[in-house]
Swiss-Prot record:
Organism: Tropheryma whipplei (strain Twist) (Whipple's bacillus)
Protein name: CTP synthase
Family from the record: Belongs to the CTP synthase family.
Stretches assigned to the Glutamine amidotransferase type-1 domain: 290-534
Binding partners and assembly: Homotetramer.
Entry keyword 4Fe-4S: no
Function of the molecule: Catalyzes the ATP-dependent amination of UTP to CTP with either L-glutamine or ammonia as the source of nitrogen. Regulates intracellular CTP levels through interactions with the four ribonucleotide triphosphates.
């Protein structure tokens, strides 16, 4: 095996077809064979990063250890490969053009006419090649669909890389949809044929096809696609009920073996130990609970994809299936919506819309003793609710929502104030991994099993230390602080007053893994399961073991 090998994942027909999960699953298979894999996403949009994008359009913003605001697919990569990636794992058109324009303005091109080829494509290639020194394979997912005008420079850069490293060191995998037409009663292969034709017109002949469908594609249709597209390696990736089955599906169809042979990789036998326990927990669950995600962006589940997967993983060890109940913070019937849930999670967000609904839902959860986990904005709203209804600070709020409140129990971080005045919103929050020291004997410390932790962050606002003492005097526990900046990182209620009520300023969902569930989510699932079992015992439906 000579040098780093490259695998490019492209998509056709429609977006959101599963390129990211295909890339993550293939990366997992190669990792399980002993290879060192680095994986990244190329996003063709002009935004520098997704940090300022609407979650209802783009989905969640995934935070890396080094503080990059990245595409949600980077979260899939981390979970499937069980690695921590950095900011080089997500490249956008905005980043590329910003860099090239900066180089031009500073005279680095020595008066050349700056063009898409070679200057933009050279910068894309440079970023594709950024990876640790000991890597065997770089998997690069190219966002969007072939034929999109925004994707053309990325496709061209990938073509050039294949020419530079040699065809034997580069593999192109094209993911395409094979739709089923109800009126005709058959699957249609023509969209995939056209998609591959567009890719070939750009100078790329795919080496393998991953055909997405809701129903199995007939052998005749697979052979037809292979013939018409001149591709021998054709894999049918049928929609599965849980995403962690995808590595098994791709392996059963031999995709990883094909890639290893094509790239002449020195790979060992596959070790399924990482996925065996996860799949067993999913397929053989012993119990089932319902946890509400109460948020502002429930219209698009992808806005909370890492929270969803963290909750699911929280139940794997105890073989507990976690069903998600979506509760919009603007819902007028929150009391009814939260009537029979076993637990609640209030994730992050921005802006004033839906805030009063969040505060109302949090009050319901606190007073009904529903196990509750607040994340970022969720924790801030927990503090606001407590200040209003327990401490008596009527009208308490955050300076994010109003400047007129008498009780700004959540306020703008000191270093963020000038940033907001100058309207510098992109990439300027408190981002990345920060340390917190937890109080001995607290719920937080008992869940983590230590008092010294690091979590990923993405915020501009903090709990106001000026009101902390009054909150503490009325029973709110400040159980974790960042000692360097004296920031409140964790709050909770005494377990004598509430079975599980905890909030964190961090985004713990970003560090959860299928095999290593995050302790906060694992704790929430355990508390929710206990609540359900007690309720069933009291109603005579079951006997506690």
């Amino acid at each position: 095996m000579n040098g780093i090998k490259h695998i490019f994942i492209t998509g056709g027909v429609v977006s959101s077809i599963g390129k990211g999960l295909t890339a993550a699953s293939l990366g997992s298979l190669l990792t399980m064979r002993g290879l060192k894999v680095f994986i990244k996403k190329l996003d063709p949009y002009l935004n520098v990063d997704p940090g300022t994008m609407n979650p209802l359009q783009h989905g969640e913003v995934f935070i890396t250890e080094d503080g990059a605001e990245t595409d949600l697919d980077v979260g899939h990569y981390e979970r499937f490969l069980d690695v921590d990636l950095d900011r080089t794992a997500n490249v956008t058109t905005g980043q590329v053009y910003s860099k090239v324009i900066t180089l031009e303005r500073t005279g680095r091109y020595l008066g050349e006419t700056v063009q898409v080829i070679p200057h933009i494509t050279d910068e894309i290639k440079r970023r594709i090649r950024l990876a640790p020194d000991d890597i065997d394979v770089i998997i690069t997912e190219i966002g969007g669909t072939v034929g999109d005008i925004e994707s053309q420079p990325f496709i061209e850069a990938a073509r050039q890389i294949r020419r530079e490293v040699g065809r034997e060191n580069c593999c192109f995998i094209h993911v395409s949809l094979v739709p089923f037409l109800e009126s005709a009663g058959e699957q249609k292969t023509k969209p995939t044929q056209h998609s591959v034709a567009i890719l070939r017109a750009a100078g790329i002949q795919p080496d393998a096809l991953v055909l997405r469908s809701d129903k199995p594609i007939s052998s005749a249709n697979q052979k037809k696609i292979a013939l018409m597209c001149d591709v021998s390696a054709v894999v049918n990736a049928v929609t599965v009920p849980n995403i962690y089955e995808i590595p098994c599906v791709l392996n059963q169809h031999g995709l990883d073996k094909f890639v290893i042979k094509h790239l002449d990789l020195e790979a060992g036998e596959i070790d399924w130990s990482y996925w065996d326990d996860v799949l067993d927990a999913i397929e053989n669950n012993r119990s089932e609970i319902e946890i509400a995600i109460i948020g502002k962006y429930t219209g698009l589940p992808d806005a909370y994809i890492s929270v969803i997967e963290a909750l699911r993983a929280g139940g794997f060890e105890s073989k507990t299936k976690v069903n998600i109940k979506w509760v919009d913070s603007d819902d007028e019937n929150l009391e009814d919506q939260l009537e029979n849930i076993n637990g609640a999670c209030i994730p992050g967000g921005f802006g004033i819309r839906g805030i009063e609904g969040l505060i109302k839902a949090i009050r319901i959860c606190r007073e009904r003793e529903i196990p509750t986990l607040g994340i970022c904005l969720g924790m801030q709203c927990m503090v606001i609710e407590y200040a209003r209804h327990v401490v008596g600070m009527h009208g308490a709020s955050s300076t994010e929502f109003t400047d007129d409140t008498q009780w700004p129990v959540v306020t703008t971080m000191l270093e963020q104030r000038d940033i907001l005045i100058d309207d510098q919103f992109g990439g300027t929050m408190r981002l990345g991994s920060y340390r917190a020291v937890l109080s001995i004997g607290s719920l937080a410390a008992s869940l983590y099993g230590t008092t010294d932790i690091h979590e990923r962050h993405r915020h501009r606002y903090e709990v106001n230390n000026g009101y902390a003492q009054r909150l503490v005097e009325r029973g709110l526990i400040v159980s974790g602080r960042n000692t360097e900046q004296d920031l409140i990182e964790f709050i909770e209620l005494d377990r004598k007053d509430h079975p599980f009520y905890i909030g964190t300023q961090a985004h713990p969902e970003c560090k959860s893994r299928p095999k290593r569930p995050h302790p906060l989510f694992k704790g929430l699932v355990a508390a929710a399961l206990a609540r359900k079992e007690i309720a069933e015992f009291n109603s005579g439906k079951t006997v506690l073991q």
